[in-house]
From Swiss-Prot:
Pfam families cross-referenced by the UniProt entry: Ni_insertion
Keywords: Nickel
Family under the similarity heading: Belongs to the LarC family.
InterPro entries in the cross-refs: Ni_insertion
High-level lineage: Bacteria, Pseudomonadati, Elusimicrobiota, Endomicrobiia, Endomicrobiales
GO molecular function: lyase activity; nickel cation binding
Residues spanning the signal sequence: none
Name recorded for this polypeptide: Putative nickel insertion protein
Keyword tRNA processing among UniProt keywords: no
Length: 415
């Protein structure tokens, strides 16, 4: 299984993650060209080789016109206001709605936009909790800067390019002490970072500084499936993303890209099932909650008709998610449904090793989802690709589907 491992012994920040992932890709110039043309006026992203404690790595530098952007939490707020095609970045205060509008207009894939927005939702929820206000009232400070947006979008672009089947991270070193932000000096980890990192293993060691920023924490929480020591894997590439500050220990986030193997005789996955009974919500309200949970990255959400006390017709809402995200989804369910309690069940799951192939057909490119394991091989064309191809070519769904199934490449036949 293609696996990405993040070693967070010196924490995590957006620029460190971008640099560490960039070292894993073959065409670095192509990424720089892409990130510099996403549609943020005046944005310039450069990579530079640096050496810390005798180890060579990459540092990402972001500039906006004449100002140099900093991705760490204590960055100075840039004073420039950029306007282009109705896209405006006011660096001192940027609302979540404005962040949504900015990302929606960027020249990146929809998958990158969705991932970036999900990361910002994690940050917005954390900031709202820390300040005791609603998400709608949140005004980002440094995190609303164009350089912070570039960090988050850059990581999403690189993750789409690398396409790991599984992403694992070590426990995260958060640092200690206090850090200066727009509201004054706050403890490390910051309230927002601490909120995001709930249910994730963290520790403090080696530095009296902030090592994990809200941006770094949110990116990791969004993409990482498991938190543990490095698994048994055949490493193919290693990346070093260097931080700005110098410490006694090398200030870097290290990435490993390689292959891991699961024994077909063992259970290879663990998930959490969150459930509650609902008998006093409208269908529209339940549908809204389901869409929100799926939008935030739940693995699956569904309802089953049930009958409750006093013979009331009701639904059983089930949300399936990764174990480390259970607290996050439980809070969403409590906030957006009428339930007073949620049942949590930890489930071991048998899962096939998955990957995605792309097939060229008469109707365009179609992605094919494949699964292998337990002496079983399966493949299935992606519904969205077939539906879009059918619409664009004015043919039936079955015609496109048959074209994929009846003309498999040699690689697909082996699956």
């Amino acid at each position: 299984m293609k696996t990405l491992y993040l070693e967070c012994a010196m924490g995590a920040a957006g620029d460190m993650l971008t640099a560490a992932l960039l070292e894993l890709v073959n065409d670095k110039a192509d990424f720089l060209k892409q990130i510099n043309s996403i549609g943020i006026p005046g944005l310039k992203v450069n990579m530079e080789s640096v050496v810390k404690c005798g180890i060579s790595g990459t540092h990402i530098r972001v500039s906006i016109d004449d100002g140099i952007g900093e991705s760490c939490a204590d960055a100075a707020i840039l004073k420039y206001i950029h306007k282009h095609n109705n896209l405006s970045l006011k660096h001192s205060h940027t609302s979540f709605e404005k962040i949504e509008n900015i990302i929606a207009r960027l020249s990146v894939s929809q998958k990158v936009k969705d991932n970036a927005l999900s990361i910002y939702r994690l940050i917005a929820g954390a900031e709202a909790s820390a300040h005791g206000i609603s998400v709608e009232q949140i005004h980002f400070h440094e995190l609303g800067n164009a350089d912070a947006i570039a960090d988050i979008v850059g990581v999403c672009i690189l993750m789409e390019s690398l396409a790991p089947q599984e992403t694992i991270a070590s426990p995260i070193n958060v640092g200690s002490g206090f850090v200066q932000c727009a509201h004054g000096a706050i403890p490390v980890p910051s309230p927002a970072t601490a909120y995001i990192l709930q249910d994730i293993p963290i520790y403090s060691r080696n530095a009296h500084e902030e090592l994990c920023t809200p941006t770094g924490a949110a990116i990791i929480k969004h993409f990482v499936k498991r938190f543990e020591q490095m698994p048994k894997m055949r490493v193919q590439k290693i990346g070093y993303g260097m931080g700005t500050k110098d410490f006694e220990y090398v200030n870097c986030l290290r990435t490993f890209l390689g292959e891991t193997e699961n024994s077909n005789d063992e259970i290879n996955d663990r998930i959490v099932q969150l459930q509650c009974n609902l008998d006093d919500m409208t269908g529209e309200a339940v549908g809204f909650a389901i869409n929100l949970l799926l939008q935030e990255g739940a693995m699956d959400v569904f309802t089953v008709p049930i009958q409750m006390k006093k013979n009331r017709p009701a639904v059983l809402l089930t949300c399936i998610c990764n174990e480390y995200k259970a607290h996050f989804f439980a809070e969403l369910i409590l906030r957006h449904t009428t339930t007073f309690g949620i049942r949590r069940t930890i489930c071991d799951r048998y899962a096939l090793k998955r990957k995605t192939l792309t097939k060229q057909t008469l109707f365009g490119s179609i992605r094919i989802k494949t699964g292998e394991g337990y002496n079983i091989k399966k493949f299935k064309p992606e519904y969205d690709d077939i539906a879009e191809a059918a619409h664009l070519n004015n043919v039936s769904f079955s015609e496109v589907n048959d074209a994929v199934l009846c003309n498999k490449t040699n690689e697909e036949k082996k699956i």
